[in-house]
Amino acid sequence: AVMAALLCAPKALGTTIGEFSIEQIYVNVPELDVFVQATDAQGQPISPDLVRAAGVELYLGDEKIPTGNIGMANEPICYVLAVDNSVDETTLKEYRIALRRLISAKGAKDQIMLYTLAGDAACVLPATIDTRAAVNAVNALESQEENEPNLVQAATIIYNDINENYQSIAPRKVIFALSEAGNTATSTALLGAVAKDAASRLNMPLDIFVTVDD
């Protein structure tokens, strides 16, 4: 099933509804089956039955999504990490730290894919659940300040890789793109180019992370 974040759902989820909160919402396209991650006051997952009973209303654009088919979102996730390594070594070091933290927090069946964007975009780690392999790939990232990213090419490569290997990649997929805040053109192009291909055509959530100088 193709999983997509509901566009109507707030980015910073966790809005309290009764005695539980909605942490994350996905919708299966085109069937429009709804999946949620909801927790109680102690942060423990709760049954979808409670979400349905609370009368939660969901909308995709102007269309109301029926909530009678709500289910628990507990399938593995593939984290597609797109790193703009055309930054300096100091910034890339910050990226490595953040990526290692993400990898260490992933579920046992969650996958990591890693792309570098400097110059010609390349997949340096195909989808894997191997935490050690993912950390080693992150540690091996090198700064290539002289090579500007080709973001249109990068978006196409990411889309094609996911599309061609769709069945072997985890059911839920999300792209994390890391870029520098100072490079506005890069950040904007990443959001536009990647969203156009991988995010919209594959119905994948997209997050852009940028670094900011103190």
Predicted regions and their residues:
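Boundary at the C-terminal end of the N-terminal hydrophobic targeting segment
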Residues: A12-G14
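Acidic/histidine-rich, surface-exposed loop or edge segments in extracytoplasmic proteins
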Residues: V36-Q37, P76-N85, L117, A134-E142, ...
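Surface-exposed acidic, glycine-flexible loop patches that form ligand/cofactor-binding
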Residues: P45-P48, G71-M72, L102-K106, N160-I169, ...
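…and closely analogous acidic/polar surface helices at protein-protein or active-site interfaces
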Residues: I70-Y79, S86-T116, P126-A133, N150
